[in-house]
Amino acid sequence: MFKEGSRDDAALAKEGLFDKLEIGIASDVTIRDKWSCGEIKKPETINYRTFKPEKGGLFCEKIFGPTKDWECYCGKYKKIKHKGIVCDRCGVEVTLSKVRRERMAHIELAVPIVHIWFFKTTPSRIGNVLGMTASDLERVIYYEEYVVIDPGNTDLVKKQLLNDAKYREVVEKWGKDAFVAKMGGEAVYDLLKSEDLESLLGELKDRLRKTKSQQARMKLAKRLKIVEGFVSSSNRPEWMVLKNIPVVPPDLRPLVPLDGGRFATSDLNDLYRRVINRNNRLKAILRLKTPEVIVRNEKRMLQEAVDALFDNGRHGHPVMGAGNRPLKSLSEMLKGKNGRFRQNLLGKRVDYSGRSVIIVGPELKFNQCGLPKEMALELFEPFIIKRLKDQGSVYTIRSAKKMIQRGAPEVWDVLEEIIKGHPVLLNRAPTLHRLGIQAFEPVLIEGKAIRVHPLVCAAFNADFDGDQMAVHVPLSIEAQLEAKVLMMAPDNIFLPSSGKPVATPSKDMTLGIYYLMADPTYFPEEHGGKTKVFKDEVEVLRALNAGGFILKDEICGSRRDETGRGIHIHEAIKVRIDGQIIETTPGRVFFNTIVPKELGFQNYSMPSKRISELILQCYKKVGLEATVRFLDDLKELGFVQSTKAAISMGLKDVRIPEIKKEILKDAYDKVAVVKKQYEDGIITDGERHSKTISIWTEVSDLLSNALYAEIKKQTNSKHNPLFLMIDSGARGNKSQLKQLGALRGLMAKPNGAIIESPITSNFREGLTVLEYSISSHGARKGLADTALKTADSGYLTRRLVDVAQDVIITEKDCGTLNHIEVSTIRQGSEELLPLKDRIYGRTVSENVYQPGDKSNVLAYAGDVLTSSQAEAIDDAGIDSVKIRSTLTCESRRGVCAKCYGLNLANGRLIGLGEAVGIIAAQSIGEPGTQLTMRTFHLGGIAATSSTPEIVAECDGILVYLDLRFVVDQEGNNLVLNKMGALHLVRDEGRSLSEYKKLLSTKSIESLATFPVELGAKILVDDGAAVTAGQRIAEVELHNIPIICDKPGFVHYEDLVEGVSTEKVTNKNTGLVELIVKQHRGELHPQIAIYADANMQELVGTYAIPSGAIISVEEGQRIAPGMLLARLPRGAIKTKDITGGLPRVAELVEARKPEDAADIAKIDGVVDFKGIQKNKRILVVRDEVTGMEEEHLISLTKHLIVQRGDSVIKGQQLTDGLVVPHEILEICGVRELQKYLVNEVQEVYRLQGVDINDKHIEIIVRQMLQKVRITDPGDTTLLFGEDVDKKEFYEENRRTEEDGGKPAQAVPVLLGITKASLGTESFISAASFQDTTRVLTDAACSSKTDYLLGFKENVIMGHMIPGGTGFDTHKRIKQHLEKEQEDLVFDFDSEFESVAG
């Protein structure tokens, strides 16, 4: 199914001398005359006695070439001297046997057969060209019905279907020769041949112009696209029906003899045999003038045999082989993980590689790895042989190999020489990001395990519990250079995803450093505890060495000073450093001997976080080389000090807080109160469950903090190993400590629901049998999740890589003026992500000035912000900055360096040719896998996430913004809407109205912002002063309340018992509750409030959603702030990446979330218009223009707006997640981009994973690459077609230049899978998913792949268009092409002058 071409094309392809590839449908003539070397007439394969191929069979040597090099079938000609001779006895050409991998044959079919890809792949290509449905076609193809090809003078219509009875009737009526009707492939062939595509195209365009129905237009546009594909290419539609079948070369479908006279064969041979057998039988039947029924059946069987060959199982039951296994057809050979694309073209096995178990190598330098001698000998064998020959030690390769096998001493000397400066690559599977493969200088070691430097373990995610690693040897000089310059471990100490150091000391190293740097200890006066003073660091170190380290208050060493004791490593001392007297400890002085001088004296404790910051600072101030040296010193120092400190934990180190009993008793009392409230019918069962869980969560936190505080303040606190380990960040966390010494806490069921009775025992006390059982119940979920989610995460990474693989840096600056705006991300008063972290390494699009001082420019437009600039902007109190982004980049292909910004892996501007798309995909995919693997570490502990109150974190003035509230009887302010917020602002002596105005125009920045939920109780008045730690508001966690805001009398409307409501007796409390239920009628359940008991004057109405429990009675008098009804929130589920990973997939696949929220389409005021077809009609009315937008909202959804609320475009009207497509339609591309980036970030942020925005932006950019044509104008584009933005603008530009009307289009959001399949390169799309559909589509319209992306070039074996040498390579190529043109030009002019 490839473009027609001669053998010369194949020769060119072999050399790789081509820069594009076209695919098309092959004609019968091409298959027979150009591809085939002969016709196969027999189904035989090989002779089972001689094992030689049968003549004329599927392995025939005459057709495919000899099985042995330079030897014909009969043995008449042997040896290379007869090259090219065709044997006169057996007809075999004397040549190399490898031609059997290239030469094809064909099978001449007795009747035309329809190719299943063109008929069965949706949309059916044949069906679309003929305008027939797939089911009609199927009946014709499989000989069930006749189709009229030429109606003649009858009353039949062309393409009309006739069953047997109808056909006989028509024949009787008009005679057999009056019309032409046929069955099977022959009928389809004739119909396709008679189709006039040009006129069909014109007719379809006409119909498309006249049709008004959207659905009909979409259908016509699809058909038009297929027909246009045939017209614009050199394909003929009748080629979709086969008269000859090409046969794959025999070496690609081998038949191998096994021991015991059996054979292993490729499934293709069985499938071909079936086709040949049926074809030969049909030919014989046709010669014998057999009855039509038998012939028809045989033809159908042949059609089915060919179907099975091309795509087994696509039509009917699959053909089974031995062991009842479906046979692998040609389609299966291409498809899926084990298909040709992914198994052989994109992933190949590599020679000169080995693998072994890894062990730690603490003695290694950062750029080294330990390579077992035996392994190195095998891997570097060719280099050793060459060196031995050069030295004259041996003269032949064979003798060199013998020498190596013997293990002669000179071999080891040569090996030592060779590996000096010859890097090797180490890889640990799974390679989730680019740090999974790094280069090291090998060091020969004894033993059989590879040794790895401790600091690179984090990058590889390796540990030493049996992990294995693969070693690869770069062979060519270029490969060695690349490994040395780009891939060495010291060049990869920062994460490309966030720019944070990845090579940071951990575990023992962190512990050792933390111990050394611990806070000073002050000895009491009576123990001679005067603070010693030293003149410089040297004196301190001398005293340390002389007096011996004193660890754990014991003297290690005999020398003492005048007070009779040695110098303690943690003792408070004074020392002169750089002219200043500093109070520090000997340990800190010792640590500073390894710190680069430029960083200054480090005089504080060193938990892992601070070590990480120090490494980053070191890189920025003193560069890579010094940082790598510093890292090695840190590793050395850390290990030595943790060994000397001899920290080990014992059971007595786990303290049980004394207040535990008291706190637990208090908790049980609170739970009893909640249970009583439930039994009295005050709260629902759901609320009881939620409140119980809240109580236990609070207890858990309280005990956890008490325990931590207790071990922290122990007299010997520096030496409580548990505290040391946790506080240093070496191992463990507060949650694990809580389980050891306080209580295990709440556990989760496998479905994520929390078991409300907690495990009150801890591991030190031991668990009861019941507690242990509950505990394992939750823990197992973690293990099961891990297994399932790892695969999900891997698949997500694969889709991300596929969608972004073509995004590379193609130019320095695209010159765009577009930008996006970024600001600090806050949650309440907490700053989740400061502005400086968001803008570091990005290009500013306009000058950034110091607020209030235009003369002071903090950053100029086009500057790529350094960390100091970003910090200055953040410190200046600037709220948001306009930066360039890959989302707005205008490069023709790929993106530009300025829009991308800094390369986070090295802090320099990104270079040309960098594969930023793949880096982005890996950055998002890698933590997904990590997180899924990490779920089980807490053993199913319930990690609930919500707080019942809001507390001020600093002093200030509280300002309500966009809040509707009502004052209840207790004087508290109850919030009535969802969209408002509380702002805490600095007290500047302004009036409340001034503050509100400044906040609404974003002229001042609030110290903290607290979004408040519906029903929240605000305890402080608007404009009141608050102090740090003061409670501002209480949040209702368990219910969504419906609150009355006006006084009056209650009247039920449409609350009909048995229809829209039902009385339910609570089993536990015995109380009767009135619950609104789902119903199908035209009822609109609501509570109306009237000013008087006679129900004359209506004050307000409140819609009641289904599931709500009504809290008031008919006719009851109520006051503002009273609860009318409550809608219980779903039981609290644990927050876990298990929910997070599917959320990321949902966002990047642009799926519609379940139970999605409705959003306002315009700015305006909310009103209700009753109910229609079980849907509530909500209207948003623009009060200025009078424009109205109707929303039909399901009665089951909970509204978060009320009548009279002002809403803005894009604001949520109901609870739930927003549909991204609606944001695009209503708010535009920018808002959608912002939404997607923030939503993906939120999932990762919840897990504490740091990913830079730019990576997510690249994925979002790829999702928004296409536009959908709404009006084609005078362009060649089609209505409803999704085209690339660049193609759309190009086409419009061409049309406008020719004076035509440009096309109109709307942006369209595609999920990553759809976007990958919609790529311009059919090779890339086919190797991703839906291989057969992609290839069919491409072949029908003769698509050309210009080999511009990564994947297609890897598949074709070309150099990839990226990497550090990409720009140079491009320039050399252009230079050579120009030279060639000049040469041709000179030659032509010379020729003319000679001829003249």
Curated annotation (Swiss-Prot):
State the name under which the record lists this protein.
DNA-directed RNA polymerase subunit beta'
One Pfam family linked to the record: RNA_pol_Rpb1_4
**Organism annotation:** Chlamydia muridarum (strain MoPn / Nigg)
Q: How does it assemble?
A: The RNAP catalytic core consists of 2 alpha, 1 beta, 1 beta' and 1 omega subunit. When a sigma factor is associated with the core the holoenzyme is formed, which can initiate transcription.
User: Which residues are recorded as binding Zn(2+) 1?
Assistant: C72, C74, C87, C90
Q: Which gene encodes it?
A: rpoC
Per UniProt, which keywords does this protein have?
DNA-directed RNA polymerase, Magnesium, Metal-binding, Nucleotidyltransferase, Transcription, Transferase, Zinc
Q: What does this protein do?
A: DNA-dependent RNA polymerase catalyzes the transcription of DNA into RNA using the four ribonucleoside triphosphates as substrates.
The UniProt record lists the EC number as 2.7.7.6
Q: List, in alphabetical order, the GO biological process terms annotated in this UniProt record.
A: DNA-templated transcription
